[in-house]
């Protein structure tokens, strides 16, 4: 993989502050970092030179893991897919309530936002109801947007639930989809390695959990119907019915349009 964990090229042209210096193990990493610096100085997206970033890897599999690509607009996705018609895309879906709270915990831990009263609904809303948070909080809309452009055989949805339950099997499934060697062992990290394991998480009270669940009630049900898999169990975690009728989902297109609009 690239020496930078999240490139953020298509959303911020890689002009982001990083908490730690990038890896630089060999000549390939050095070439990548030098090319990335030049590329990020350009005024707009340059797909040709972006593709050249991965040339040092030659025939090896390589890619770009950037969670915020889930917020890219249809136009940017279209351009990417037209330039890379055989691009394989993976989306890791997570229960919106859990994802939102985990993200707030991370932001507080890294002092991206000020600590707040986690028991106060108004304080929670002030930190939660931000454009950047909401853009990444609707996995059903993200999947729908990418599916409009990526061929079905080149797009896969995986679930954070599977990462928690059986990380080894999830890793094998992803490697199989990518066409990688399933028997090759990682010489550095195990499948269940979690760099965030030591991070202190904010306490999620029952009151706030219920509040967030009500906010995401429709999205939880939409994910269950549209994404399937472990998402089918998400509504029941919060006491919501898992029975779905066509008319319950009839205005999903309004939700997708709204998410596209704020993107």
Protein language model regions, located:
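ATP-dependent NMP and nucleoside kinases share a basic, alpha-helical "lid"
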Residues: 71-90, 140
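Generic structural signal for well-ordered alpha-helices
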Residues: 47-51, 77, 143-144, 220
């Amino acid at each position: 993989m690239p020496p930078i964990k999240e490139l953020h090229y298509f959303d911020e042209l890689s002009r982001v502050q990083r908490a730690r210096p990038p890896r630089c193990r060999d000549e390939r990493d050095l070439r990548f970092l030098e090319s990335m610096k030049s590329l990020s100085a350009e005024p707009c997206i340059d797909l040709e030179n972006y593709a050249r970033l991965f040339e040092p890897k030659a025939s090896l599999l390589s890619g770009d893991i950037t969670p915020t690509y889930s917020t890219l607009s249809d136009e940017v996705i279209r351009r990417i897919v037209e330039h890379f018609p055989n691009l394989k895309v993976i989306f890791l879906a997570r229960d919106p309530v859990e994802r939102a709270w985990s993200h707030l915990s991370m932001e507080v831990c890294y002092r991206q936002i000020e600590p707040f009263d986690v028991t106060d609904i108004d304080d929670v809303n002030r930190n939660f109801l931000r454009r950047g948070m909401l853009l990444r909080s609707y996995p059903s809309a993200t999947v729908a947007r990418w599916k409009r452009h990526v061929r079905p055989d080149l797009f896969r949805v995986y679930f954070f639930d599977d990462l928690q339950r059986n990380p080894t099997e999830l890793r094998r499934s992803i490697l199989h989809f990518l066409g990688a060697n399933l028997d090759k062992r990682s010489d550095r990290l195990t499948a269940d390695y979690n760099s965030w394991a030591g991070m202190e998480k904010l306490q999620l009270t029952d009151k706030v959990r219920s509040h967030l669940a009500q906010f995401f009630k429709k999205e939880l049900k939409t994910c269950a119907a549209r994404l399937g898999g472990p998402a089918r169990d998400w509504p029941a975690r919060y006491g919501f019915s898992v029975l779905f009728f066509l008319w319950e989902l009839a205005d999903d297109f309004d939700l997708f349009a709204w998410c596209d609009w704020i993107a």
